[in-house]
Amino acid sequence: MNCMFHQMQKRSTNTCCQNLQKILDHLILLQTIHSPVFRLDRMQLRQMQTLACLWIHQHNHDHQVMLGAIKWISPLIKQ
């Protein structure tokens, strides 16, 4: 049951949030390209993006929730 729920969550995230993941990818790349200290390996980045997308999706893509998730992934982003 838990595995099925996880697969359903993953599918809805992938369907709904592919563009959001691209945006997060781009923002993180911009923030970390000149700062090796803040670079995350690809697997960590993907896990964080998936969590952020699930969180945003569950909150109906609310603008403030999106900003909060982006700041969580890349706290260097200026408002």
Curated annotation (Swiss-Prot):
Keywords: Host cytoplasm, Host mitochondrion
Protein's UniProt keywords contain Iron: no
Subcellular localization, as worded in the UniProt entry: Host cytoplasm; Host mitochondrion
Entry GO terms, CC: host cell mitochondrion
One Pfam family named in its UniProt record: Rota_NS6
HAMAP family reported in the protein's UniProt record: ROTA_NSP6
Stated family: Belongs to the rotavirus A NSP6 family.
Quaternary state and interactors: Interacts with NSP2 and NSP5.
Protein name: Non-structural protein 6
Organism: Rotavirus A (strain RVA/Rabbit/United States/ALA/XXXX/G3P11[14])
